[in-house]
Design a protein with these regions (language model features):
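Short, surface-exposed, charged amphipathic helix/loop patches that serve as local interaction elements
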Residues: 2-111
């Protein structure tokens, strides 16, 4: 069964479930992407979050709330998608923030 499509207030960004439409086409390793499928967020487990925190810590990151950091969110996004972390690291700033916010909002029950 299809879930509802959401139109964000400015009218130009449409999302379906946990599929994030990019603000402009993004080239990664010779392929053009117009969306990021984060539907795997529904399958994330606490052990994935623990592992993401370890990866975040080993990279030198520190935060009292690591779930709010972009790097942590990208580790989770990698686990929730078919994309490598380099895919997320290469996103334009606006789309990178939208991915981070999507993951963060998912954790805190706002997605």
């Amino acid at each position: 069964m299809d879930k509802e499509v959401q139109v964000v207030e400015n009218g130009d960004i449409i999302e379906k479930d946990n599929v994030l439409m990019l603000t402009k086409p993004y080239m990664f390793e010779g392929t053009e992407y117009t969306e990021v499928d984060l539907s795997g967020l529904d399958n994330i487990k606490a052990r994935d979050m623990i592992e993401a925190e370890k990866i975040y810590g080993r990279s030198g990151g520190f935060s009292f709330i690591p779930e709010m950091s972009m790097e942590y969110a990208f580790v989770i996004a990698t686990r929730a998608s078919k994309y490598p972390i380099e895919f997320f690291q290469g996103l334009p700033p606006r789309d990178a923030m939208r991915v981070k916010n999507k993951v963060t909002n998912f954790f805190f029950g706002m997605a």
